[in-house]
């Protein structure tokens, strides 16, 4: 994984449906990341599906600032291990709400962590970047429309 830190979050989509899950990094031990796995309330994951997801490379980075909110509404499944060689797409997107209330989107390089583009409004080009069909986009847009803030 690229530049992973404790507390970082990832989401996954199950079988191209509207079922989502959440993975949080707990620690790194040797060549393995210890993670907590949560599922969205409407998700239905079996142990086999969980193992399949954890051993795949379909993880997407989610901005850390709303981790507590996601976990609050997720159902805790258990702790698991994933290999540290799991990789991510080169370019990812994240976003944050500024102190003045403005929403800003970032495109960043997952290898270097450098922001390569900043947008003041959601642009169609962002749809092609991960996380695409994850909580990262629709969930956060909805929450911001409801007045969600960092505090």
Where are these regions (language model features)?
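Short coil-to-beta transition motif at edge beta-strands of beta-rich domains
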Residues: 2-14
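Intrinsically disordered, low-complexity segments enriched in small/polar residues
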Residues: 18, 31, 36, 58-59, ...
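Short beta-strand-centered aromatic/proline hotspots
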Residues: 19-28
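Basic/aromatic-rich interaction segments and small domains that mediate binding to polyanionic partners
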Residues: 28-50
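Intrinsically disordered, low-complexity, charged/polar segments
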Residues: 43-151
